[in-house]
């Protein structure tokens, strides 16, 4: 006679792999506030609208801020546009200038783009949803000659940027 002995049992293996994290993101956006005044300084209309910070503008900001190299600001200069544009992240200065730049104006008596002077930034708090902002002082553009329609504005800065109207140098920021 044969004798067989068997055993039985349960075996279980459980593995848990978890990766928890929080995403921290930063968006760059801006708003233009435009006021139109007549020759006597009376407000004719004002408008506020969002602007797009283009890819090359974001790259310039990150390259100068995070790389740690020395950098001095050239500009920023605020130009005006003479055509209705559909902003794209791929826009560069040659997208706008010279064909779409409105040039029938002076700033301080000279036919130049206005220099944007930004204040130190401020923040609404320390939570992830806070808003950090920096505002620029107002620039007065005096429309000359036959005038025309101003459709928008653009900000250019960086190496090669110039206050000279119709100049394509520099990096388009927005």
Segments predicted by a language model, with ranges:
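Small cysteine-rich, disulfide-bonded extracellular modules of the LU/uPAR three-finger superfamily
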Residues: 1-151, 157-174
């Amino acid at each position: 006679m044969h004798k067989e002995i068997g055993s039985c049992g349960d075996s279980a293996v459980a593995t848990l792999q978890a990766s928890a994290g929080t995403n921290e993101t930063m968006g760059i956006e801006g708003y233009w506030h435009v006021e139109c005044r007549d020759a006597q300084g009376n407000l004719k209309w004002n408008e506020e609208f969002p602007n797009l910070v283009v890819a090359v503008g974001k790259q310039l900001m990150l390259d100068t801020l995070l790389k740690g190299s020395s950098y001095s600001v050239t500009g920023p200069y605020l130009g005006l546009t003479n055509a209705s544009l559909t902003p794209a992240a791929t826009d560069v200065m040659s997208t706008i200038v010279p064909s779409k730049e409105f040039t029938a104006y002076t700033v301080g008596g000279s036919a130049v783009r206005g220099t944007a002077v930004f204040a130190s930034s401020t923040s609404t708090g320390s939570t992830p949803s806070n808003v950090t902002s920096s505002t620029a002082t107002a620039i007065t553009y005096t429309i000359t000659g036959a005038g025309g329609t101003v459709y928008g504005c653009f900000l250019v800065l960086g190496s090669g940027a110039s206050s000279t109207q119709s100049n394509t140098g520099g990096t388009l920021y927005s």
